Amino acid sequence: MTFVKKSFKNTLILSVLMIMVSPLIIENVSAQSSAQSEADRAREERNKRDGQRTKKSQAVSKSVYEKITKAQEIMEAGDNDGALKILNALRASSKLSEYEQQNVLNYLGFVYYNMEDYPRAMRAYEDMLKIPSIEEQMAKTTTYTLAQLNTMEENYTKAISLIQRYFQLETNPPPAAHILYAQNLYQLERYKEMIPPIETAMENDLRRQKAARQMAKEKAEVELKKARGEEEIAAATVKLRDATRRANMEPIIKEDWYSLLNFAYFQQENFSKVRDIQKILLIHYPKKRYWFSLAGAYTELGEDEKLIYAYDAAHTQNMLEKSVEFVTMAQLYMQAEVPYKAATLLDTEIKNGRVDKSEKNYRLLSQAYTLAAEDEKALPALKAAAKISDEGEMDLRLGNAYLNLAMYGDCVTSVRSGLKKGKIKSPDNAQISLGMCLYNEKEYLDAIEAFKAASKTNRSKRIAGQWISVIESDIERNRQIELAEAAAKKQLDDLKRRRDQAAAARI
């Protein structure tokens, strides 16, 4: 069905557009946390003056640390320009070690990011990567941040190159990195290549969730063993029970990841995969658009018999809202040979104002009632459709409904109205219906004229001729009856006259 297919495609595109705007803003907060962690590490190193200090090249001097901290405080107070002034002054110093340059550039990049000056933020991070002695972890973080920023700036090819470099540096990348890779591939319309990174992200995420839950369970078990006193034991028992329950539950993948994978498979026309993904989404994220997408997948796979179940489920959960959605549901009921259900749905929603009061919808309602053998209930819908329409077809249908209900006078009025409007698909059939109604109203001459008009087409010539013969026979029979009745009356009158004459003679 057209609406189902259109809704199917629109839902997939909307889902991808939604996922494209969300992860980057969240992920880039890592830039700030990296800068803070480096500053904290420098402070810790300064406190280890008992011989456990790191190499000089990996230390931050007191003055540099204090200025970075000051810049951080100023930025958090909302003075980005003040923070930049301090950091740029530091950067200009020729006395900075490579490690100190690394920390200054890292925080400088974050300030620019906070100001939404992404090009300058990227330049700062790119300069960081040029430092020969940059720490491995910092190189990983910076490369990934640059990939995110290039994605935001729509430099998708460069972003892909950076992510690939990040994968070379990071042996165990987070699932979100694979999703970022897939998002950039999407922007370049490399849809087939999207599938492996998304599925890798899902597999890794499931593994991480299971491991984290198992660790939480084991930790809770240890805490219970260490617990003392009734309250402490009770609290530890509850915690272990919750941790055990979570460990036994199947982890749930993020909704937007499924949406992205769904779109990738859709572009490959792998509708069986699309169908399976919709079913998973409906288990964890039961939303209207996924029922429609499932219905669309069934349509593409030729599994039309299952289409109604998807739509009916959405209807049962009160997810249908638009007129076209209710009409589609009614059409599916009719295809499934449950026309009465279609009729009651349309009737109710037209009265509620959620289905448009159009000729098309009233016609569908009348068809549903007619197929359900509820001709009388079809009349109001047919009347409404005939009133709206400037074509005679609906008047003819109304006339035929009256004919079926033996309401012949109304039938004549409606069919004549339809013939007057014109634009009837089969005028000969209209004349036959008119002739039948006129015949039952005993308007024989007008009925003959209607059947003569119908007989002008080869299709209706025979049946019209048969009706004319029937009417002429009825007219002749009625004439014979009238003659017989007249003769009988004459005989009765003559008999009465003779009796009257005989009675008078006796007097």
Task: Indicate residue ranges for each PLM-predicted region.
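Generic helix N-cap/helix-start motif at coil->alpha-helix transitions
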Residues: 60-68, 98-105, 135-145, 170-180, ...
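N-terminal leader/linker segments that initiate helical-solenoid repeat arrays
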Residues: 8, 21, 25-126, 133-141, ...
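Alpha-helical adaptor scaffolds
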Residues: 359-373, 380-429
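Solenoid-like repeat scaffolds
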Residues: 53-59, 91-97, 129-135, 164-172, ...
